[in-house]
Regions:
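Polytopic alpha-helical membrane proteins, predominantly small-molecule transporters/carriers
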Residues: 1-131
């Protein structure tokens, strides 16, 4: 579960880094927005990298790399949706809600049977050296 919380926190930082400037005045130079966004995004790596290592089956976690990516994308979508509605105050069209529902359905499909998949098809990245 720590994997999910770390991925969630990393997605909050990344969403803020990518979209906060849309509510900022246009008088600020683009380079300023880029530098501030980079400073917000940098700590995101400090959360995402450990989350992926902790969650990967080859390192004792429960997920394949593909499953981790799909989880990350689903979390990014949820975080973005909240940011869009609360901070940017933009409305979504029904087509966008349907598109998001399809992505979440894909998450369900990808995670179904994950323990069997992870145990059977992913080889450990770290093995003991045989003398």
């Amino acid at each position: 579960m720590n994997t999910i919380w770390l991925l969630l926190a990393s997605n909050v930082l990344m969403t803020v880094a990518w979209y906060w400037h849309l509510k900022s005045p246009a008088s600020v130079p683009l380079l300023g927005f880029i530098l501030i966004s980079w400073l917000i995004a940098l700590p995101e790596y400090g959360l995402a990298v450990p989350a992926n290592r902790m969650g990967h089956v080859s390192l004792g976690g429960s997920f394949s790399a593909a499953q981790l990516k799909i989880i990350q994308e689903a979390l990014a979508l949820v975080v973005f949706l909240i940011f869009l509605l609360v901070v940017l105050k933009e409305a979504l069209r029904w087509q966008e809600y349907v598109g998001m529902a399809l992505i979440m359905t894909g998450l369900g499909v990808a995670l179904s049977g994950r323990t069997r998949y992870a145990a059977a098809s992913v080889k450990p990245a770290i093995t003991e050296v045989q003398p």
